Amino acid sequence: MASLVVIVSLLLAAFASPLLETAHSYNVTAPRVSLNPIDACWRRNPKWATNRQALAHCAVGYGKAAIGGKNGPIYVVTNPSDNPTRPSPGTLRYAVSQPKPLWITFARDMVIVLKSQLMINSYKTIDGRGAKVEIANGPCLRIRQVKHVIIHGISIHDCKADPNGMDGDGIRVFQSTHVWIDHCFLSRCHDGLIDVIVSSTAVTISNNYFTQHDKVMLLGHDDSYMGDKDMRVTIAFNTFGPGLIERMPRVRRGYAHVANNRYEKWQMYAIGGSANPIIFSEGNYFVAPEKRSSKQVTKRMMAGPDSKRWKWGTSRDVFMNGAFFGPPGVIVRPLYKGGEGFRVAHGSLVPSLTSSAGPLRCYVGRIC
């Protein structure tokens, strides 16, 4: 009888705990898992592969209107090679450089090592569903002065600096609008994992798995750049996993709605900012590190006495292992419009809602 109890306990623990290995090997989620509003929009449909563009209706938050390549044909990447000066048809670089809308998919599993940063044109979707796609060990993605880009279901890691100027970010969003980054895995890049800078806005970052990195996510170019005061970013349903140090995110001047994310033992701080940004932390799940001096969730950088009046609010967050938000300020709720709003759950539900963060292992004819 005792051995039976032990076996049952081990099985329950295995199903209840999200594993780092799952994030690396792509998630296969049990059908009974609680789905967040984005995933509930499409994952229950076993015929997802026959209408891939339906995904474009599923974003929430400030990036809700991002349509990517919804109004264009499917383009299948068949060749993982890269030639920055003369991209070959069938390669990812060839697809993203086209002027027309495209919904880009992949014929098989592949690792793409880029020789220079991948400049993504407007009205493009990179859709990794149905294949295990990695962009790694070279320069990575740049979304510059474009609009309507969706990046879904790929792994981006070990990104290098580009000799032609990119710092080595996983994804850099520069002067761009209507961008949605969903169900990606990001880790170990030379600079940031995701930067949203220089007047970029209308961005949603959701369902991603971040791990093993220092400066995770930057929103806003620098403290003196006033153009970012109109920046609006939604960060929802992500897992900030082991080995992260800071910037989850760091915000400058603009507005960030940080909702229903899971934070696992950051090393310095989780959410920070400078230059008087507005931050609303809602329904997150914070597990503090063991180090006593790092248990505060927030950090105000280069801040004088006025920083105590910054509008950094917390609502329905869960604080574990001694985590605490810091001096709470006025709550400024997001002014969503046109269907951008979504139901934010209490932080206690976040372990379930984020259990499928990262790329999903999807098979044609089956629910993801």
Curated annotation (Swiss-Prot):
Its cofactor is Ca(2+). GO terms for biological process: pectin catabolic process. Keywords: Calcium, Glycoprotein, Lyase, Metal-binding, Signal. It comes from the Eukaryota. Coiled coil: none annotated. Pfam families: Pectate_lyase_4. Ca(2+) binds at residues 167, 191, 195. The active site is at residue 247. Belongs to the polysaccharide lyase 1 family. This is Probable pectate lyase 4.
